[in-house]
UniProtKB/Swiss-Prot annotation:
Occurrences of domain GST C-terminal (ranges): 89-213
Keywords: Stress response, Transferase
Protein name (Swiss-Prot/TrEMBL): Glutathione S-transferase APIC
Catalytic activity: RX + glutathione = an S-substituted glutathione + a halide anion + H(+)
Amino acid sequence: MAIKVHGSPMSTATMRVAACLIEKDLDFELVPVDMVSGEHKKHPYLSLNPFGQVPAFEDGDLKLFESRAITQYIAHVYADNGYQLILQDPKKMPIMSVWMEVEGQKFEPHASKLTWELGIKPIIGMTTDDDAVKESEVQLSKVLDIYETRLAESKYLGGDSFTLVDLHHIPNIYYLMSTKVKEVFDSRPRVSAWCADILARPAWVKGLEKLQK
């Protein structure tokens, strides 16, 4: 049975899963979810994701939600497909896991808030909360200072090769690079180079094309 991703093309979480599938050379069907009408908060969608968020994922009889859990499933179950997104070395895997936690717990809260305020709200006709932007930018800057130090030690956050750690960052960075927050990334040379590297990955470019069809 075909892999299905139920989600919205504008959703960073949907983008994250799509990019992972394309990195692994896996075909999938994108099943659009109309979030404007609230489809994600109603049945039958709630049978796929009881929290009413996107995406939801189906691989045969298996149903998953939470984008980072989905990408980890894909990377492990389809380890022999496409690009290797996880580190097999038992001494390197914990380092990758640490930085995956950092992305989810330290980067995501501030980056996603900025994406919402500066990237999504203008598209859907909502007013940006300038105070929220200012506070989130300050907090994101602190995280990126740590990233700048980390990237002096290795080419990517999880180690010397591109992994899920880096992939998980891409959707928010993609949105923020077209906003005034771009300067927060560009002012840190190693962070700026890392962003350019991961945004140029063919799988990400292909994923955007698929989502925007």
